[in-house]
């Protein structure tokens, strides 16, 4: 299998910006958030199960999952959160493995927000953490998602702390305000990852 770089960070850290910078260099992406959306589109067994469990109110008028309402329900009810996780996590994991196995590039960026929380570190060859202060996270989430401070606090409380995430980092990108610094940092890491991927390929070939 291709060399796997897990790209992780808290909500509002700018993972998508960093992932897109790698994609601009021709690096393939496997994004857990996109997979999580794809497995609950209308007509999927997962969306049917969620609708049966929570009722039709959990759908938008056009039949899609009302993600904001679901998030509200599970962040205030641990039992419901566990139910949703037990339904979706195996499906996300299965589809992630399928996509990763199809990659033929030297390495892949696996965008996985809850890498630390869901104890998935063993599936990656290397971990890249997008780091940002909690204050900037809160500001970005409020602006982007239009949710209130209490909901943001609930989301942050459910995620690994900044220090926990950094403890597992092999590499770090600081994504506070200096957007100009991102491109050269990503280019530098890209070269490093190509070397690591080649070294791993040689090791596997020698075994």
UniProtKB/Swiss-Prot annotation:
Swiss-Prot/TrEMBL catalytic activity: 3'-dephospho-CoA + ATP = ADP + CoA + H(+)
GO MF annotation terms: ATP binding; dephospho-CoA kinase activity
GO CC list: cytoplasm
Chain coiled-coil ranges: none
SUPFAM superfamilies (UniProt xref): P-loop containing nucleoside triphosphate hydrolases (SSF52540)
This enzyme's EC code(s): 2.7.1.24
Location in the cell: Cytoplasm
Gene Ontology biological process terms from the UniProt entry: coenzyme A biosynthetic process
InterPro entries: Depp_CoAkinase, P-loop_NTPase
Residues that hold ATP according to the record: 12-17
Domain DPCK: 4-200
Chain's role: Catalyzes the phosphorylation of the 3'-hydroxyl group of dephosphocoenzyme A to form coenzyme A.
Family: Belongs to the CoaE family.
Protein name, per record: Dephospho-CoA kinase
């Amino acid at each position: 299998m291709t060399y796997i770089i897990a790209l992780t960070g808290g909500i509002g850290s700018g993972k998508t910006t960093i992932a897109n910078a790698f994609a601009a260099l021709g690096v393939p992406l496997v994004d857990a958030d996109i997979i999580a959306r794809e497995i609950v589109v209308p007509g999927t067994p997962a969306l049917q199960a969620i609708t049966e469990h929570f009722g039709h109110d959990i759908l938008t008028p056009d039949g899609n999952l009302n993600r904001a309402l679901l998030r509200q329900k599970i962040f205030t009810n641990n039992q419901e959160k566990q139910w949703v996780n037990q339904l979706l996590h195996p499906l996300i994991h299965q589809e992630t493995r399928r996509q990763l196995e199809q990659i033929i590039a030297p390495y892949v960026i696996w965008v996985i927000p809850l890498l630390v929380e869901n104890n998935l570190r063993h599936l990656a060859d290397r971990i890249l953490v997008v780091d940002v202060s909690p204050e900037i996270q809160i500001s970005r989430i409020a602006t982007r998602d239009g949710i209130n401070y209490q909901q943001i606090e609930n989301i942050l409380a459910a995620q690994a702390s900044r220090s926990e995430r950094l403890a597992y980092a092999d590499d770090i990108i600081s994504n506070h305000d200096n957007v100009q610094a991102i491109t050269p940092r990503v280019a530098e890491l890209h070269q490093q990852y190509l070397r690591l991927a080649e070294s791993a390929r040689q090791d596997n070939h020698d075994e």
